[in-house]
Amino acid sequence: MSDSDASRPSAIASDGPDAAGKHASGAPWRNFYGRFKGKTLKPNQVRDLDEMLPELSPGAVGWDENPEREPLDLEAQFQGRDVWLEVGFGGGEHLVHQAESNPDVGIIGAEPYVNGVAMLLGKLRKSSAENVRVHAGDARDLMDVLPAQSLSRAFLLYPDPWPKARHHRRRFVTQEHLEPLARVLKPGAIFRVATDIPDYVRQTLEEVPKAGFKWLAEGPEDWRKPWGDWISTRYEQKALREGRTPHYLTFQRQD
């Protein structure tokens, strides 16, 4: 993967903040480094976005509909079940696999790239899973309104590597993202990270523990072998074809 990988979000230009550093809606200004849309959507994908996405909403996430940032009612959404979060679900293979394998768990996926959202919806249309909610936007906005200590597990799988050194601050594994994630995870919750980029591994191992996580590894096999419930994604297959080695990192949220 690279900055020019068309299958991942790429840099875009956007309007700047006002003098107070906020949008007109009151939302804090957050740089988004990526595309929201790629190839032209097929008619069935447009239909899925129009028909399915509103039904799968986790609730009022956007600043325009929830300016007071009231917490989402996950109890109403998932009837008391454990809730998991996948940050940047790509084409949705892993999310659908987990939803089908764990019907007693609620899963929220956050993905700003509309083509990826459309791919997930297409898979869900063919799936029996009824335990999924989808936020088609920035995970930071979602984490704003998730209740504290409400999630039992989180996944970050083959995120955009931003390989250039000057772009490393754009990676998810910075405190800007990790501290909000730690806030919404329960003590003891699991955070899984998969990546094929050695420097991303390095930054992950440096930054994630600073946010209150413990790396659960006793030996090399703990990060060389995939998790027992793993399904290989298209991004992983691309990495393997190009000769890169996947790493599977497991962290636990501390008290």
Swiss-Prot record:
Alphabetized UniProt keyword annotations: Methyltransferase, S-adenosyl-L-methionine, Transferase, tRNA processing
Catalytic activity: guanosine(46) in tRNA + S-adenosyl-L-methionine = N(7)-methylguanosine(46) in tRNA + S-adenosyl-L-homocysteine
Biological pathway: tRNA modification; N(7)-methylguanine-tRNA biosynthesis
GO molecular function: tRNA (guanine(46)-N7)-methyltransferase activity
InterPro entries (alphabetical): SAM-dependent_MTases_sf, tRNA_(Gua-N-7)_MeTrfase_Trmb, tRNA_methyltr_TrmB_bact
Family listed: Belongs to the class I-like SAM-binding methyltransferase superfamily. TrmB family.
Protein name from the UniProt record: tRNA (guanine-N(7)-)-methyltransferase
Gene that this sequence comes from: trmB
